[in-house]
Curated annotation (Swiss-Prot):
GO terms for molecular function: palmitoleyl hydrolase activity. This is Inactive palmitoleoyl-protein carboxylesterase notum1b. It comes from Danio rerio (Zebrafish). Belongs to the pectinacetylesterase family. Notum subfamily. One of its GO terms (biological process) is negative regulation of Wnt signaling pathway. PANTHER family: NOTUM-RELATED (PTHR21562), PALMITOLEOYL-PROTEIN CARBOXYLESTERASE NOTUM (PTHR21562:SF7). Probable inactive palmitoleoyl-protein carboxylesterase. It comes from the Eukaryota.
């Protein structure tokens, strides 16, 4: 693994500087972009100065489609419906890892991790409420 790290650092000019390993939370100020429970949405970012490559990762997490399924989801998977317990930083793993041994192709890219908290399969939402009282995605 030391050979991989040495090779990776020799190939990229930005590798000689100290790279930030933590992705920092950025909460969105646009009040119309929220999680299911009304908390603000956001993203984590790690900039790699000198790199022109970007990796944007949208977290998955399934969906809910009615008041009943959303209430059940909130009880069992609250982290996928709220930003209230998001930590201020995250360490990337796998393809988001800043370690060349773990991620030899993208370790020094600028990375963005977008947590999933809207239960809409990344399709957006509507301000209208359906006949059953459910506000959600236009599917």
């Amino acid at each position: 693994m030391a050979q991989v790290k040495s090779l990776a650092q020799s190939l990229y000019p930005c590798s000689s500087q100290r790279l930030e390993h933590q992705m920092k939370l950025q909460i969105l100020k646009n009040s119309s972009v929220t999680c299911n429970d009304g908390t603000p949405a956001g993203y984590y970012i790690k900039e790699s100065r000198g790199s022109r490559r970007w990796l944007v990762f949208l977290e998955g997490g399934w969906y809910c489609f009615s008041k009943h399924t959303c209430d059940s989801r909130y009880e069992s998977m609250r982290r996928l419906m709220s930003s209230s317990n998001w930590p201020p930083t995250r360490t990337g793993t796998g393809i988001l890892s800043p370690q060349p041994e773990e991620n030899p192709h993208w370790w020094n890219a600028n990375t963005v991790f977008v947590p999933y908290c809207s239960s809409d399969v990344w399709s957006g939402s509507t301000p209208k409420t359906d006949q059953r009282g459910h506000q959600g995605a236009l599917n």
